[in-house]
Amino acid sequence: MNIAKLIDHTILKANTTKEDVMKVIEEAKEYKFASVCINPPWVKLAADELAGHDVDVCTVIGFPLGASTTETKAFETKDAIAKGATEVDMVINVGALKDGDNELVEKDIYEVVQAAKGKALVKVIIETCLLTDEEKVRACELSVKAGADFVKTSTGFSTGGATAEDIALMRKTVGPNVGVKASGGVRTREDADKMVAAGASRVGASASVAIVLNDAKGATDNY
């Protein structure tokens, strides 16, 4: 298995510098990761630098809380695509999900999907660590109904990250035709292999190089 082509090479910390982003971009070129996942201000730089390389440009929407308005998320999506993003990872309205406001949650996702239609893949971050199993299933069902391409476990900025159990539940819920992305706490090749075995079709990690080289000592924390 070519694990590199399943990895979104990620850097999303608030103190990320241009030098940090360039390092991630160069590593993505070298190891041929599926994408680089970066904050929106770096999208144009990444798109320019990765032109002609088989590496997608992924960014985040409504990140990390999901607490932006639907209109804001849709605008962020259009803006990111205009600057060169080919994948967007959006955070759901977690509070609305917990309130049982399925209509709002679905509309929130749907508007981002519509903004991205034909131009970028949409991955929906449900923030599993804050949800019950019933809420995880409902979030996945609403994501599929709204037309999302992927569901994703975590932002990497909340109380927990991906677990194999959550990946299995999400895969069972969405079926074979929607992607499942494991993110948050995936730091070693063993972690990544567990997620893929459980049903993940993409892995988000900042320790991507260590994962590919199977070097546990090189793994870094978080995003």
Curated annotation (Swiss-Prot):
One of its GO terms (biological process) is deoxyribonucleotide catabolic process. Its main location: cytoplasm. Coiled coil: none annotated. The active site is at D89 (proton donor/acceptor), K152 (schiff-base intermediate with acetaldehyde), K181 (proton donor/acceptor). Keywords: Cytoplasm, Lyase, Schiff base. PANTHER family: DEOXYRIBOSE-PHOSPHATE ALDOLASE. This is Deoxyribose-phosphate aldolase. It comes from Bacillus cereus (strain ATCC 14579 / DSM 31 / CCUG 7414 / JCM 2152 / NBRC 15305 / NCIMB 9373 / NCTC 2599 / NRRL B-3711).
